[in-house]
Structures are given as C-alpha cells and as structure tokens.
Amino acid sequence: MVIIMSEAELKEAMKRNPHLRRYIENFKRTYMRIPDFMVSLSRELKELKYPNIIYPVGDPIFIHIFGTPETKTKYIVIEPTLETAEEKLKYKMILNKILELAPYEETPKSVEEFEEVLTRLFNACTKVTEAVGEEGFFQRIFRFADNKIKITPEERDKFLYILKRDLIGLGNLEPIGRDPYLEDIHVIGPKNCHVVHKIFGMLPTNITWEDEIELADYLKNLGERMGRPVSDANPIVDGTLPDGSRINIIYSTDVSPKGPSFTIRKFTDVPISVTQLISWGTFSTEVAAYLWLCLEYGMSIFICGETASGKTTTLNAILPFIKPNSKIFSCEDTPEVKPPHPVWQQLVTRERGPEESRVTLFDLLRAALRSRPNYIIVGEIRSVEAAVAFQAMQTGHPVLSTFHAANVRKMIQRLNGDPINVPLTFMDNLNVALFQLAVYQRGKVLRRVVSIEEIEGYYKEVDGVVTRAVFQWEPDKDRHVFTGRNNSYVLEEKIAKAAGYEDPRDIYNELELRARILEEMIAREIFDYYQVRDIIWAFYEKGLEGLPFPI
C-alpha cells in the first residue's frame, strides 16, 4: 500500500535534514516541480512511466526515483555529504584525532558498543557552536583553549553520520544497504553502480568511487570484515554481509578488466509470505494448497529455476506449511532460508582454512542423517551432495532444496550427469519439482511458477523417468491451471494413503479447503509472514475452530 507523506511530515523531515531541503530546492529550480513524498511504496507504482518519488530509508537517507521522457529513470541517493573544503578539512582532522585516541579504548564487543565509543571519541575532540564569527580560517576551526575542533550543529550530525557509515556501516553502499525495496546491487568498476528495484527494475545510481584504487581498497576492507579477504592471489570471493545479504567479489583487474566488480543479493529480514506471493500472481491458491499438503505429509520438493527467478523467496514462503512441532535441519553455503520453527538446527559450510578443517555441504548432509530431523533443507544442490540428499529421502527424511534447472527434462539431465550422478532409478525419491521463472510480459519482469511436476519413477519400458504435470501456467491469461485434478500421483498414491482415505479422491476436498483458507487470508489482506504462519499453525492445532475467521 502506498502511504504518502503529509505536508507537515515533509516540513519536519526537511527541518531535521538540511541536505534534503537543499536537494528539493535545487530540484525545484531545475524542473519547476517537486517530487511526490511517500512513506512506503507499492507495486502499483510499477505502472508509472516517469516516476518522480522520494522515500525515506531511515534518517538522514532518502531515495529519489526520477525519470523523464528525455532521461532514463535513475536511482538517486540523497544523504549528507562534505560540500566545502573547510568541511572536508574538519572531517579529516576529526577522523585523525579519533584514530589517535582509539587505541586507548577497550575493544567494542558489539556494533552498539562500537557506536558508543565512536560517539564518545567524536565528542571528545569537537565542540559544537552556533556562530562561527569573523575569525580567520584556523581560528574558525580551533578553540585553542581546549584544542577542540569547532563545528556547527549541522556539521555534527553530518560528520557523525559519515563516520558511522564508513567505519561501522557499508560506506558508499550504506544507503542502498538500508533500502528494503532492492533485490540486487551490481557494481562494475568505480563509476558503474546499478540496482535492481523490486518495483522499478534495473536502475543506474549516483553512487561512485573516486577511482579503481579507492574501489579496490573498499573491497579489501569489506572482505576483511567478512572474514573473506580478497587479493590478486585470491581474486574471487563469496561472502555474507552483516545483514545476511550475499556478495560475490571479483577483485583483480586481470580477471575483471573494467575494474573491481561485485554483486550483492539483498537479504530480506522477514520473509515474504505465501499470501503475498499469491496476491502478486507468482502462483495460485490451488498451487499453494497443493504445496501445503505436500509439506504437511512429508514430500520431498525441489524449487527449480534460473538465476534470480525467486527460488529462495518461494522456499521461505512455503516453510510455515511444515508442521510446527517438526525439527528442521538446514545446511547452506550462505544462510538464506529462515524456517519459523522453534526447533531449527541451522548449519553453514566452512570453505576457508586448511583442507582438513573445511566443512562442505556433503559433510553437513551426512551429519543431518544422524540428527533425526523431520525435514532437511539444503540451500542449493549443485554437486556430489545430491547423492546424500537422495540417500536421506530413501531413509525417510524429506528434503527441500533449490536447484538450477528451467524444466523437468533439464533437471533430470543435471541430476543424472556429472558431477551430480544420481542414478535414474533413484529419481522417484524426489516427489515434486516446482519450476519458477522470471518472465518478461507487457514490459514487466514477472516471477511465475510455470509448472509443477510429480516424479513417478523410472520405467524400464521407456528407459526413462516418467513425470506428471499437475499445474501449468498459461501466459496469455496469466493464470495457473490445475491439470492434475483427479489425476495426481502424489496426492492420490502418496498423501491420500498416508492420510488414511478410503477414497483417494477425497484428498482434493482437503486441497480445496486449504485453498479457501488462503483465499480468506488474502481477502482480509493478511500478508504478514508471521501472521500467516500463526493462522496455518492454529489450523494444525485446532482445525477450523482455530481460524480467526469462518470458512
């Protein structure tokens, strides 16, 4: 839902943030209009051909999305900057003084302590004064009695923000790191930073570095802070930022001729709910109800698709369908899955260090078999760990994972070929494969589940694996068709039998009931991930009586 900032709120924001006021004044002089100010955005804004929107991402940072018929839509960061030579000198002197005093402080144990120490040191070497007077240059900066650097209230806020941004935060990338509406960040050299916005797509930004040397130093610092140092000898590094976002760094100009480059896949603190994905058209209520039954009854599912198709988003969205008293075991290279269950054993690989101390996905999956989980979640299956995953399925441990494949034929080819090498006769241990793609339609990039396939098994007569499509997406009508109604192998032969139905086709009534529950949540605009989870779990505990609405 779009929430527009009131005039009073806008005036207050400009009063708190003089840099915002100056930006708007300059913009108005140039374009003879002012942007629309919004507290929050909605996907409806995607219809705007030439957006002119400013929204906050936490004081003192604002984002301006602006396009005209003559210029491409841009992503403009509005933040405090050092504007004059005097400000730059003051800031440099303050930073040097802080670095001189820092060794005498105890090492902070948390970000909060780091901020406290930094603020204390900043206050120790500065003095805020309203008037600068008519003194000379150095007299304006120093009050010689206490050797403190004289600064104005606006400079205090500005310098503290820049210090915390550069020493504690993400430096140049701090503003876009805070933006909840971003999916990816792409930097190729010091002057080329683009973002993928959840509403407006790929946009160029005004974020730059002075030159390749400054960008290389920035990436070195980032790598050290992640515990994944980069160098010419180790130019390609994958890591995780403090907020959980994934980053891939390509450091050396020998490998990246346009200059050091990197890509960040933004991490969402609270996962997107299944009802939200349904409302966006990613899949239908029937698809979600089918997945609900599959997870309720311990089916193994692969969420398949190409890069940036939304596989992990869908995986996280459907996790509340797993019963609340289940033990979840997750193993990943980079932590991304977030089961909302109280008994969740989260493990990640360790790729650095001596060979004998490294821990691979293969190692973690072997450990999973000894941990007695109800569900095993693998971030992404790419190699020999697939053999252990299929072994887990064989021994009654359902497995959820993402997998790179555009359709069921390519999925089976990848699983059966090098380096994975799962025998065709083992394929029926996997019950369901969901295929999701990013599709370009009517000038927009949409994420859609394009099909769901059930794996029946290997048949010697056809010398291949037989699969059955139960859902298909019709692109011309943008709808999902339940082609497996009264013809689903998994629902009738697996789930209905496990549920004890005399007539296996009664399982479709259960599917329709769950679809109605999801439809009612959407009608009531229940999109919060944890609210959706609570309703699903209340249904598990008390049936229809546990729901906060009639069905």
From Swiss-Prot:
InterPro entries: P-loop_NTPase (IPR027417), T2SS/T4SS_dom (IPR001482), T4SS_GSP_E_ATPase (IPR050921). GO terms for molecular function: ATP hydrolysis activity. CDD domains: VirB11-like_ATPase (cd01130). It holds the Pfam family T2SSE. Belongs to the GSP E family. This is Uncharacterized protein MJ0900. It comes from Methanocaldococcus jannaschii (strain ATCC 43067 / DSM 2661 / JAL-1 / JCM 10045 / NBRC 100440).
